[in-house]
Amino acid sequence: MATGATKLTAPGPAEPFRVFLLSPADCSGKRAELLQRPDPGHPLGRKLHGGGGAALGEVFSFVSSLYFRGKLAYARAFALPPRGQGGIHVITPSDGLRPPESLLRLHDLRRYAGVPVDAEEERYRRPLLRDLRALAPAWAEAEVVLLGSIASRKYVELLTAVLGDRVLFPSDFVGRGDMSRGGLMLRSVEERRELPYVPLLGAVRRGQRPARLPPKGGEPREVT
């Protein structure tokens, strides 16, 4: 179960507690395969093969590149968890929720690669529901923000089954692809500007692709 980094400062009167759930990286893709090679050239791969492991957030940031890096940076900037609780929880393919600081080893990465992230997959579903139910009481006064895919069932169905209308997502995610979302979150961190959130239940989760992010210091560019 995730614990994550703990913030001890309480929010102001108008600011709610907020925790983030980050969707996992694709552990069966080419970048994940690079880390699993017998003689990995990347320092991160050597950590995994060395037995000591590497931080989950670091591994997923390498595997997913811009998208997960954006999610993790954004969550670190804006998490405001209840006292004694972690503010960032990573959804994993078969270990439920884990903090980004937890150690991932080579056999974990290989195991993740073999488990589909699908609402009907019991190896994914059961651990996630277990951890959501265990943490739900601690989140009674908190907003729970999903940073991940909102268009499919794989996260939406399970999160809302336990947490109901407490689950939110950034409304600016609608219509954007992974790379665009990653860039949007990194831009938000740089500008110290939190995105607006809406409840996941009943929301419009599909839409037209929005305009591209404007260049820094320039005018918005429309999608062509």
Annotate each language-model stretch with its function.
Residues A2-T224:
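Peripheral peptide segments
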